[in-house]
Amino acid sequence: MDQQSFPSFMASTHFDSSINRNDTRLRIFSGTANPALAQEIACYMGLQLGKIKIKRFADGEIYVQLQESVRGCDVFLVQPTCPPANENLMELLIMIDACRRASAKNITAVIPYFGYARADRKTQGRESIAAKLVANLITEAGANRVLACDLHSGQSMGYFDIPVDHVYGQPVILDYLASKTICSDDLVVVSPDVGGVARARAFAKKLSDAPLAIVDKRRHGHNVAEVMNLIGDVKGKVAVMVDDMIDTAGTISKGAALLHQEGAREVYACSTHAVFSPPAIERLSSGLFQEVIITNTIPVLEKNYFPQLTVLSVANLLGETIWRVHDDCSVSSIFQ
């Protein structure tokens, strides 16, 4: 993808012409979790992916060997820790260790989807805070920086003792919605739970300051959600539900059913991360949604595609961020 296809919400951003986009000290390597996204990122940047050998032994152990020199290089490792989360996390840690032992100057873990991000606090007694543990593991493995996309909660950045660049996938989805022929007066942005209100409010502000509605739910267990009521008016409106991720789709599908009951004309689901644990596909393709809009931070299996699904790419966004990190330029200015 060329720079012309960069989201229009960031098109007004002045790309610093002083950025050295031909620096031979920059290396990008891909793990096995999402090689298609890594290839898109490299294509946007005009680079080739670094040569790396990753294999599994018969007993399940992971082997990583860099097949080119990274001595003194600025290395970026693209590896979301999506399902299977433990496999992909361990692979990332071994990749980081291999780069450190090969004398890379800087190692940035590019984690489009950060697994364990939901385990960011104790909700009951005697629970672990796995997000902090994973942050420690990545740091101890030898990473100098993390580049993550739409973390589940802001406090996760504070769990790392190294710099974290937080990239937002929101502009990519906003740009797509802006291309659709939906009257701004008909729009209402809906948060599927109280915890996502800040995210939905920021989204609504970008959509001509659209009104906001909130689905009030009570969760009785992991991956189980019960919708209680709706705060706000959606009658005759096009409801756009916004969340950072769709896992089993229980929350968002029950919320959509409630929106239809309350008179919504159409319901769109927008999410950066498509975890799609069963029975998500059945729920999302049941006819509740006019369209389900996601990004490719997590690869979607071919069997999980359905007619209402639209997958947008964050490759340009991540590629531009990598250039700016490498050249010590501002990252936040991309989103202003």
From Swiss-Prot:
Region of interest called Binding of phosphoribosylpyrophosphate, as start-end residue ranges on this chain: 236-251
Region forming the signal peptide: none
Annotated GO CC locations: cytoplasm; ribose phosphate diphosphokinase complex
UniProt-listed Pfam families: Pribosyl_synth, Pribosyltran_N
EC top class named in words: transferase
Catalytic activity: D-ribose 5-phosphate + ATP = 5-phospho-alpha-D-ribose 1-diphosphate + AMP + H(+)
Tagged with keyword Magnesium: yes
SMART domains according to UniProt: Pribosyltran_N
Residues that coordinate or bind Mg(2+): D150, H152, D161, D165
Enzyme Commission number: 2.7.6.1
Biological process, per Gene Ontology: 5-phosphoribose 1-diphosphate biosynthetic process; purine nucleotide biosynthetic process; ribonucleoside monophosphate biosynthetic process
Keywords assigned by UniProt, alphabetized: ATP-binding, Kinase, Magnesium, Metal-binding, Nucleotide biosynthesis, Nucleotide-binding, Transferase
Highest taxon of the lineage: Eukaryota
Magnesium is among the record's keywords: yes
Listed GO MF terms: ATP binding; kinase activity; magnesium ion binding; ribose phosphate diphosphokinase activity
HAMAP family: RibP_PPkinase_B (MF_00583_B)
Assigned protein family: Belongs to the ribose-phosphate pyrophosphokinase family.
Protein name: Ribose-phosphate pyrophosphokinase 1
Name of the coding gene: PRS1
